[in-house]
Regions:
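Short, solvent-exposed loop/turn segments at secondary-structure junctions
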Residues: 10-12, 39-42, 84-86, 109-112, ...
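A conserved donor-nucleotide-binding helix/loop in the catalytic core
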Residues: 50-80, 86-92, 103, 146, ...
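Conserved donor-nucleotide/metal-binding helix-loop-beta segment in metal-dependent transferases, i.e.
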Residues: 86-127
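Long, compositionally biased intrinsically disordered regions
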Residues: 226-282
Length: 282
């Protein structure tokens, strides 16, 4: 499956993204990569951020960029936020994870299960969050949180995914809420999976996990095991995923990215209209 890895970053996040991009290549992942940044990166096809797309704090800009990318000739588009790091090449290809479904994000932790210990997600009480999902069309018995930093979309589903994500934004705003994009991403994984259990995070702990508690604080992941805590249940497990969402390693990733750019200064941006040929190596 022809796959494009893509991301968007600005400010210090572009240095984190530079560190991520190098880690992807260093472990031997060969999929094409496209970035949108406020200054060029090195070692990847780098386009300037689209000034027509508002980089809103709640990050619904991700859906606008997804819609923008649908003109590119790829089968699968994999979004990875800048504060990630690859410690080895994943055993499963991205195409193996998405399977036959049009969309994937890891459904991490149950919101309305006997295992649930946390009383809210994004400040919304669990019962109210479940009701919000139900009102939008989610009908699975158990509803799960997700992480908005890593997800995949097939090309034929991109326009519908973007439309649905932005529709959910408006839906929850009409309910008096101001939730970030990852709630919409969770909704998509519930609604558009033939078997949503194939999205459950526990099936992919060796591929990806989010380090949000600070056990790797200010350190770049190095392939060692670390203690993962599931957000809603607070259950812990020792993990060593190939891809770490290193949420508490930002300062180390910034410094790493700066050093990479000093050693290998970036070239100019690739104009968006030339991105396809640049990715093809023409």
């Amino acid at each position: 499956m022809k796959t494009l890895i893509w991301s968007v970053a600005w400010g210090d996040y572009r240095y984190m993204l530079q560190s991520l991009m190098k880690s992807i290549r260093d472990v031997g992942v060969e999929h094409d990569i496209l970035t949108f940044t406020d200054q060029p990166l090195t070692g990847v096809v780098s386009c300037k951020t689209d000034e027509r797309i508002e980089l809103d704090f709640k990050q619904y800009w991700k859906f606008h960029y997804l819609n923008k990318l649908k003109s590119l000739e790829y089968d699968l588009f994999v979004f990875i936020d800048s504060d990630h790091y690859f410690v080895r090449k994943p055993e499963k290809d991205f195409s193996d994870i998405v399977g036959d479904d049009p969309w994937h994000s890891f459904l991490e932790s149950p919101i309305n299960s006997p295992r649930t210990r946390r009383g809210d997600w994004w400040g919304v009480p669990n019962d109210a969050m479940v009701e919000l999902y139900r009102g939008f069309g989610v009908n699975q018995g158990t509803v799960y949180s997700t992480n908005g930093g890593f997800w995949m979309c097939r090309r034929e589903f991109m326009a519908h995914a973007a439309e649905t994500g932005l529709l959910f934004r408006d839906y929850q705003k009409n309910k008096g809420l101001d939730l970030p994009e990852e709630v919409a991403i969770s909704v998509l994984s519930h609604m558009f999976s033939m078997d949503y259990e194939s999205r459950f995070h526990y099936r992919y702990m060796d591929t990806w996990a989010s380090e949000w508690t600070g056990v790797l604080k200010d350190r770049i992941p190095d392939g060692s095991f670390w203690d993962f805590q599931e957000y809603m249940t607070m259950e812990t497990k020792s993990v060593n995923p190939a891809i770490v969402h290193a949420m508490r390693s930002k300062s180390a990733l910034v410094e790493s990215g700066k050093q990479i750019m000093v050693k290998n200064p970036p070239s100019d941006f690739v104009a968006w209209e030339n991105a396809s040929s640049a990715l093809a190596g023409v």
